[in-house]
């Protein structure tokens, strides 16, 4: 609606509820520069208050609050007049605007300032009425007098000149900081009576701020507004009248899904999905267009990646984790909307009742898991793309490429099984199978252990895309096969994960079983329970062929006389035929006496309990004393051929080694409180006994050698 350039005196009197008539001491139609001339300003007398300046001396004094408000307005007018500025301008303009205003030296014509003085007149009347009655001003613009009609006609002529001024001022507003109010250019008054309420404002604002003042920072959306059109150079707010956008450029209809907006610009009307930034020509409720028909590319493709976990030996596994990009899916009722050119096609075969009848037959075997899928094709991959840290990005690129491809699904060059028709993906035992649902024809069988990588699409609208990478049997080429699933693809990934866990468990059990069967059964005969023991060390065992003379109890654990007495008693009481041919096995821990023919154990003695050993008076005799119990000792006697030197040395070495082990074990434990006997004493005692026996042996042999050498 056109704005009146001035208001009639009768309308002002009607609004002031019968108050006194207002008169102005200065001409309203005079030139602005004439009123603001430096000479006139020097000789002019500033009125004391706003009412005296407006010619209302008879009006009673207003209240304290109104007086303060009027005083602030008066100060602003005085500062504006002193600075030679437009009094209808807001005093809070930036320094850049002040500099641009001072640079304009050409005076404005009186015709260009008529509208500004009319606004000042309107502001003054409103301020006077507010101070008198303390109520809101009601302006009736219906009944205009002849004076108002003339001024209105003049104002309409002036609007053409003001349009050019508004364009210049808008360019200044673009360069000025946000948050500063724009200058008053137009006062818009409704056609009917309207109450202009005074909200909470600062008292320092002038009266011109009460009408039509626009804030350039009205909202966060306007302050950072950027046009979405490809060819639009405008950076202004959509509220600007000269902006590239019209007021109805953005529409959110109730028939659109949540998150969608209808946008209108010079390129036409298209639909914008706010969370993802995707745009399309067709409404989102209809069949989605291909990417080539979209006015602009997707602004962002979100990829959160797959969780790389330990898989089986021949491949990797990605576990589907909760996506952090969940807010990006807001507003998409159907994840397939606005994504694929074939999304409107049904993935279930027709008719539906027949499909439901076939489901029990498909899942008749509980060990088989079926999933309705559609092959999107395959993409060749390299070993470098499957490297750790790069495989997830490579597979996601394959999913994007095959999901957005522009070729027809029925194109045989797409490389998909079933020529783009519905298929059944079956997980049976350890095999992934692709079966035609109609005649149950097997199209492809892939061993699960040969799958290198599999994953689920994580982009917005890609929750039903499943892909796996395996090597082709014929070409030995790595191929990434992508499928569009009827249900969320994470169900397939979970099932594959369970199968892989089962395969790994079976392999571990089989490996343990093979390791157990590889053992020598002859060594496990005497073991009551098959338990894994540490592998024993192979100890050196020496065997000697002797005659076992038997064992007799003795009174003392040590002494050569004890051994000689036992040997003499046995030799005198028995003959050679009564002696038992035997084998003596000498080990570092045990001395074992076995029968030569029957291999029966005649005696087994622990080396740790051996107390004394010696060679008898006859070099063929050897004996040692063992502790059979507390204060109980036994002497074992042998007849050796050709002599007892080798057997005595072997038993002595076993005693030395065993005693050294006992010393090492006692030094590591602190529980024992008994002092360890010196090693020299034991070694000296055993060595002295053996040395004495050897000396006696050599002494018996020496006379024979000397006698043999004499002629």
Curated annotation (Swiss-Prot):
Tissues expressed in: Brain, not in liver, very low in other tissues. The long (neuron-specific) form is expressed only in brain.
Post-translation changes: Polyubiquitination by RNF157 leads to degradation by the proteasome. Phosphorylation at Ser-611 by SGK1 promotes its localization to the nucleus. Phosphorylated following nuclear translocation. Phosphorylation at Tyr-547 by ABL1 enhances transcriptional activation activity and reduces the affinity for RASD1/DEXRAS1. Phosphorylated at Ser-460 by PKC upon insulin activation.
Domain of life the protein comes from: Eukaryota
A GO cellular-component term linked to this record: main axon
N6-acetyllysine sites (modified residues): 205, 702
Domain WW, first and last residues per copy: 254-286
Localization per record: Cell membrane; Cytoplasm; Nucleus; Cell projection, Growth cone
InterPro entries for the chain: APBB1/2/3 (IPR039576), PH-like_dom_sf (IPR011993), PTB/PI_dom (IPR006020), WW_dom (IPR001202), WW_dom_sf (IPR036020)
GO molecular function: amyloid-beta binding; chromatin binding; DNA-binding transcription factor binding; histone binding; molecular adaptor activity; proline-rich region binding; protein-containing complex binding; tau protein binding
Residues carrying Phosphoserine: 135, 460, 518, 611
Segments forming domain PID: 365-533, 538-700
Phosphotyrosine PTM sites in chain numbering: 548
Coiled coil spans: none
Start and end residues of each stretch annotated as Disordered: 140-257, 277-300, 321-364
Biased composition (Acidic residues): 156-174
Polar residues biased stretches: 224-235, 288-300
Annotated Pfam families: PID, WW
GO BP annotation list: apoptotic process; axon guidance; DNA damage response; DNA repair-dependent chromatin remodeling; double-strand break repair; extracellular matrix organization; negative regulation of cell cycle G1/S phase transition; negative regulation of neuron differentiation
Keywords per UniProt: Acetylation, Activator, Apoptosis, Cell membrane, Cell projection, Chromatin regulator, Cytoplasm, DNA damage, Membrane, Nucleus, Phosphoprotein, Repeat, Repressor, Transcription, Transcription regulation, Ubl conjugation
Quaternary structure note: Component of a complex, at least composed of APBB1, RASD1/DEXRAS1 and APP. Interacts (via PID domain 2) with APP (with the intracellular domain of the amyloid-beta precursor protein). Interacts (via PID domain 2) with RASD1/DEXRAS1; impairs the transcription activation activity. Interacts (via PID domain 1) with KAT5/TIP60. Interacts (via the WW domain) with the proline-rich region of APBB1IP. Interacts with TSHZ1 and TSHZ2. Interacts (via the WW domain) with histone H2AX (when phosphorylated on 'Tyr-142') and the proline-rich region of ENAH. Interacts with MAPK8.
Role summary: Transcription coregulator that can have both coactivator and corepressor functions. Adapter protein that forms a transcriptionally active complex with the gamma-secretase-derived amyloid precursor protein (APP) intracellular domain. Plays a central role in the response to DNA damage by translocating to the nucleus and inducing apoptosis. May act by specifically recognizing and binding histone H2AX phosphorylated on 'Tyr-142' (H2AXY142ph) at double-strand breaks (DSBs), recruiting other pro-apoptosis factors such as MAPK8/JNK1.
The protein's name in its UniProt record: Amyloid beta precursor protein binding family B member 1
Species of origin: Rattus norvegicus
Organism ancestry: Eukaryota, Metazoa, Chordata, Craniata, Vertebrata
